From Swiss-Prot:
Positions annotated to bind 4-amino-2-methyl-5-(diphosphooxymethyl)pyrimidine: Q41, L42, R43, E44, K45, N73, S112, K141
Cofactor note: Binds 1 Mg(2+) ion per subunit.
Cofactor(s) it depends on: Mg(2+)
Lineage start: Bacteria, Bacillati, Bacillota, Clostridia, Peptostreptococcales
Enzyme class at the top of the EC tree: transferase
Chain sites annotated for binding Mg(2+): D74, D93
Main function: Condenses 4-methyl-5-(beta-hydroxyethyl)thiazole monophosphate (THZ-P) and 2-methyl-4-amino-5-hydroxymethyl pyrimidine pyrophosphate (HMP-PP) to form thiamine monophosphate (TMP).
Record-linked InterPro entries: Aldolase_TIM, ThiamineP_synth_sf, ThiamineP_synth_TenI, TMP_synthase
Gene (name only): thiE
Family, as annotated: Belongs to the thiamine-phosphate synthase family.
SS bond list: none
Name under which the protein is recorded: Thiamine-phosphate synthase
Sequence positions that bind 2-[(2R,5Z)-2-carboxy-4-methylthiazol-5(2H)-ylidene]ethyl phosphate: T138, G139, T140, G168, V188, S189
Length: 209
């Protein structure tokens, strides 16, 4: 592990403006943080570089206010430009060891994985945590191969860095997932897609304690 500060991965919010249906982006992130989100990842695959940068600047100001880490998905340049707390990359993004060399030792590096082999490689390459999934069908990532709870447990038991579950996690399945013993859950629609974002986050937070 490279990042020296203690990070609570418990309720890991991942952004998606599409599920907000036109609601204010930063206000929605704030509601999620007030409801208990412990870390925020900005994931905006469709945004232009300028738009992503402007969103990231606003998100950084918000997360700093609440002392919550801000992670940027994929875009190392944006993360460095706004001095985000870290970067999260997938298997088809820049290799983790390259990202680590770019962001240095004092930023958080997360890597998406689906197997123990990928997870071990991520740790060797300098990852601080891994996001394992997709655990359930999800509208935000249609190409993800499902990971079973038994596979998730196997990965967790064989890893020394924090493991975050991702993919289709909601109030109906969150307790079952947390019983595996992982360190947190990454949530998109089950928070940002709800009418009352703060209440949705509070309810999920209560389920992981």
């Amino acid at each position: 592990m490279k990042y020296n500060h203690t990070v609570d991965y418990g309720l890991y919010l991942v952004s998606d403006r599409d599920v907000l249906k036109g609601r204010d982006f930063i206000k929605s992130l704030e509601e999620a943080i007030l409801g208990g989100a412990t870390i925020v990842q900005l994931r905006e695959k469709e945004a232009s570089s300028l738009e992503f940068y402007q969103l990231a600047l606003k998100a950084k100001a918000l997360t700093e206010k609440y002392n919550v880490p801000l992670i940027i998905n994929d875009r190392v340049d944006i993360a460095l430009a706004v001095d985000a707390d870290g970067v999260h990359v997938g298997q088809s993004d820049l290799p983790a060891h390259i990202v680590r060399s770019m962001i240095g030792q004092n930023k958080i590096l997360g890597v998406s994985t689906a197997t123990l082999e990928e997870s071990k490689k991520a740790a060797e390459d300098g990852a601080d945590y891994i996001g394992v999934g997709a655990l359930f069908p999800t509208g935000t990532k249609t190409d993800a191969n499902p990971v079973t709870l038994d596979q998730l447990r196997y990965i967790k038991e064989n890893m020394d860095i924090p493991v975050v579950g991702i993919g289709g996690i909601c109030e109906d399945n969150i307790k079952t997932i947390m019983e595996v013993g992982i360190d947190g859950v990454a949530i998109v629609s089950a928070i940002l897609g709800k009418e009352n974002i703060k209440e949705a986050a509070e309810s999920l937070k209560a389920s992981i304690k």
